[in-house]
Amino acid sequence: MATAQTVAIPVVDPYGSVFRLLRSVELPFSLFRVEDASEVEADAPFAILSSYGKADAAVVEELSDRVPTVVYAVQVRANEPAPLMRAMAYVSDRMPVGLIRDVITAAVERASKP
């Protein structure tokens, strides 16, 4: 499999806000936006799934059954538990940018190992 620096990661984001936030994180790989989880190819090395408010467990499960997935949550209330479900990792807009970058990069590296 290609190294993390040579892959393009799909970001499932119907509204585009998470995609814009991720561009500011300066990840060491390319990103491209899709509007629906069904648009992520089964051979994608990895995916980032946006979640506005509470994550949809069914969507997380469906996508993470096909490809390793990180959930990026925005607008989550502090008293709501992080719905990790079957995702590899979970990040939130409340986290520092450096930590978001570290969590996503580590998850991509884990997913790319044979």
Which ranges hold each PLM region?
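Non-catalytic signal-transmission and effector/linker regions of two-component phosphorelay proteins
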Residues: 1-30, 96, 101-114
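Short amphipathic alpha-helical segments
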Residues: 22-24, 59-62, 82-84, 102
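Active-site regions of enzymes building and remodeling cell-envelope glycoconjugates
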Residues: 26-32, 45-46, 66-70, 84-94
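Active-site-adjacent beta-strand anchor residues
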Residues: 11-12, 49-50, 90
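Conserved phosphotransfer microenvironments
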Residues: 19, 38-69, 73-80
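Output/docking surface of receiver
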Residues: 34-35, 73-114
